[in-house]
Amino acid sequence: MTLLQISEPSQVSKPHQHKLVIGIDLGTTNSLVASVINGQSKVIMDENNEAVLPSIIHCGKHNKLTVGCDAYPYAKTDPTNTIISIKRFMGMSYEEVSTFKNCPYQLIKDGNNVLFHTSMGNLSAVEISASILSSLKQRAENSLGGVLSGAVITTPAYFNDAQRQATKDAATLAGLKTLRLLNEPTAAAVAYGLESGEEGVHAIYDLGGGTFDISILNFSKGVFKVLAIGGDATLGGDDFDELIINDCIEQLSINELTPAQMQEIKQFSRIAKETLSNYEFSEFDCIKRPYCITKKKFETLAKVLIKRTLLLTKQAIRDAQVDVKNIKNIIMVGGSTRIPLVCSMVSDLFNKPVLCSINPDEVVAKGAAIQANILAGIKSQNDILLLDVLPLSLGLETMGGLVEKIIHRNTTIPIIRAQEFTTFKDGQTAMSIHVLQGERELVRDCRSLAKFDLYGIPAMVAGNARIRIEFQVDVDGLLSVSAVEQISGVKTNISIKPSYGLTDVQKEKMLKDSFLFAKTDIQTRKLHETQVEANRTIEAIDSAIKKDKNMLDDKMLNNILNARNTLFDIVHSDDEKAISIAIENLENSCLKFVEMRMNSSVMKAIQGRNIDEF
């Protein structure tokens, strides 16, 4: 018989009798793992007392996998089997990654996905990321002395549905239970906010190795509320390295590079970038030829990239509806914020000094560990509530190729929101549901996420059916959609798990286009809505005439048909006003007919019944 042990209320639990949970910063360049130990969030070191694990793997012969620092030397000697910056490939299609510049890997198309051809076989980005997560998991279990119960894993705030799902899949493959996916700037804000205790509105500027995020948050009485987010999931330190790579190739007039030479230049360029943060120039040998770049030239090249981040920052401030003067602190996160020009230009934008005092490499992992502790139910003096937001609007296609937005961008998540729709035609027994993402008014200008069908709708007159469609976005930012026909109770649902998702360029373009074409979109939407109404009116009139033509004399019938044909002839034109007038004329010509049909229906309903029955 198993006995349950219950300790005395006054006894202190032994260390690690509670659940062991961790926070992981799965970065483009480096990854870290942290845990709350004795009430303090601390980064867990490896056996060499190193905090960071370089996000690099080498696939060797005889299935020998090397992760982290030990994999670096292979980048030069075996570049096609040494994968760096795998985070950039997460949730991407083959078409998207094939546009990446200076890519030394052998990529294989597998449906919508991309595989890396290595000596260990064809591997996906999910599998490669899983090996990095597995290494961090092993480090944590060795240090904490037990089996982990779960982890909070951070992702860029601007990661789309596919990229988030890929991250969760990688964790599952690594044997990690994902307690929550947490946006990187939010994690940084948690660590900073609890450390400083300073309430108010803060901006988190997060420029990492491969991604950029900007978040505007309000911290008040233990509640972190994200007001707005922005970013670019394909802009980071790697792009600053590319500036030096391209300058080197141009300066030395290099026409072609082997994969090994490309990896060598990449490593030297990264070192040069870091050197220029402290010195006026950097030089190295490129294919046995000397190359030198000055700090001034690098900053001239880098300004273009930094300005891109500032444009996104301004947009986030507008979305948050806050005055820049009311933002108390600008917290700099991510290794790329060590570039002096980045801090200088961000400081100029906000007209105040930025906070660089916290370790930009460790703060995200520490914040994730704090949140993991809370989700595991481990009591703390600093329990907090995180309220994150959705980066882009979600909606459905309606008649006329229009988009009906169900959840708008920058809405706090998790959230459930529902809306009722109806049928367009008499006797319609099925409905096709098309889920979209974006800010524009028309389907053709938004991104398709999924399509599914609802069958079994009872046949009835158009407009009588009631279909409730519910959108649910969880705390990880993942979407599921359900549809229920209210009368029959027939139901269908789908979890949105696309094999690849939006590139950040597409996201940024969606937002820009939503502003540039706002007026045109509204006019186009109005035209399409009027056209839909015209078609609905024509179908209703045709159906009524087919059933009750005998009620009409020749004159009334001709008047209705003339008005109907006039509308039919212009329904696909671009003249919204003319269509509206034609609809009104047709409805006016049918007033007597509608009255006659109503009277007929009433007479049929009361025929053979007495007053006491009503």
Swiss-Prot record:
InterPro entries: ATPase_NBD (IPR043129), Heat_shock_70_CS (IPR018181), HscA_NBD (IPR042039), HSP70_C_sf (IPR029048), HSP70_peptide-bd_sf (IPR029047), Hsp_70_fam (IPR013126), ISC_FeS_clus_asmbl_HscA (IPR010236). The keyword DNA-binding does not apply. Keywords: ATP-binding, Chaperone, Nucleotide-binding. It comes from the Bacteria. Pfam families: HSP70. The gene is hscA. GO terms for molecular function: ATP binding; ATP hydrolysis activity; ATP-dependent protein folding chaperone; unfolded protein binding. Chaperone involved in the maturation of iron-sulfur cluster-containing proteins. Has a low intrinsic ATPase activity which is markedly stimulated by HscB. One of its GO terms (biological process) is iron-sulfur cluster assembly. The keyword Endoplasmic reticulum does not apply. This is Chaperone protein HscA homolog. Belongs to the heat shock protein 70 family.
